[in-house]
């Protein structure tokens, strides 16, 4: 199965394109966690669905780490001289197709970890060893100025919800449906943003 031309992505094929990423690349290791990339994202979405969360939270959890696959979107080059932050890369790709609440959940899920560690010290105890390591690389807990700025985001509640799902989606033995179970919901979010 070959990758489609990203310049031809539109509301009619973006959902299938993302599904292809899950199918082709989902078995990749998830940063030292006991789950694959697909399992991680599917677990977050499944937990959200089981808890009756709104579709925007479910889809935000499902797609929050899609930026790890920047090569699928033509955004990676061997000439790159700096990190392409996966959260920003993912949001950049999705923002033309999805409402801002979803792209904010993607763009700020790393910042939300830093925020929660600064404002709810007990949150740190939820973090896995790999997540603690990445927290250090991401700048550690936010300072007071960063917290105040972050709290201005109108989608703060949803971003925080996805962050909790991000941390919860690391269970080695959890059964989940596949991406295609969520695909109709993903399409509804695309249609909501782009006009049905």
Curated annotation (Swiss-Prot):
Fe cation 2 binds at residues 65, 86, 109. [(1R)-1-hydroxy-2-(trimethylamino)ethyl]phosphonate binds at residues 30, 68, 86, 109, 113, 131, 134, 163. Gene3D superfamilies: Hypothetical protein af1432 (1.10.3210.10). InterPro entries: HD/PDEase_dom, HD_domain, OP_Dioxygenase. Pfam families: HD (PF01966). Fe cation 1 binds at residues 30, 40, 64-65, 166. Keywords: Iron, Metal-binding, Oxidoreductase. Binds 2 iron ions per subunit. During catalysis, TmpB uses a mixed-valent Fe(2+)/Fe(3+) cofactor. Residues 37-156 form the HD domain. GO terms for molecular function: metal ion binding; oxidoreductase activity. Its EC number is 1.13.11.90. It catalyses: [(1R)-1-hydroxy-2-(trimethylamino)ethyl]phosphonate + O2 = glycine betaine + phosphate + 2 H(+). Its cofactor is Fe cation. Involved in the degradation of the naturally occurring organophosphonate 2-(trimethylammonio)ethylphosphonate (TMAEP). Catalyzes the O(2)-dependent cleavage of (R)-1-hydroxy-2-(trimethylammonio)ethylphosphonate (OH-TMAEP) to yield glycine betaine and phosphate. Is highly specific for its N-trimethylated substrate. This is [1-hydroxy-2-(trimethylamino)ethyl]phosphonate dioxygenase (glycine-betaine-forming).
């Amino acid at each position: 199965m070959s990758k489609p031309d990203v310049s031809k992505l539109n509301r009619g094929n973006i959902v299938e394109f993302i599904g292809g990423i899950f199918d082709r690349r989902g078995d990749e290791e998830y940063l030292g966690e006991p789950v694959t990339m697909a399992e991680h994202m599917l677990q977050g979405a499944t937990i959200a669905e089981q808890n009756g969360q709104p579709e925007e939270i479910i889809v935000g959890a499902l797609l929050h780490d899609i930026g790890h696959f920047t090569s699928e979107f033509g955004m990676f080059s061997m000439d790159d001289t700096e990190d392409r932050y996966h959260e920003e890369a993912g949001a950049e790709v999705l923002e033309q197709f999805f409402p801002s609440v979803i792209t904010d959940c993607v763009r700020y899920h790393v910042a939300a970890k830093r925020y929660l560690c600064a404002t709810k010290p007990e949150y740190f105890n939820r973090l896995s060893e790999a997540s603690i390591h990445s927290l250090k690389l991401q700048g550690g807990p936010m300072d007071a100025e960063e917290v105040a700025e972050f709290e201005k985001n109108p989608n703060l509640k949803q971003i925080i919800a996805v962050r909790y799902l991000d941390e919860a989606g690391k269970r080695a033995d959890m059964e989940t449906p596949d991406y295609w179970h969520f695909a109709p919901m993903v399409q509804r979010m695309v249609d909501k943003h782009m006009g049905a």
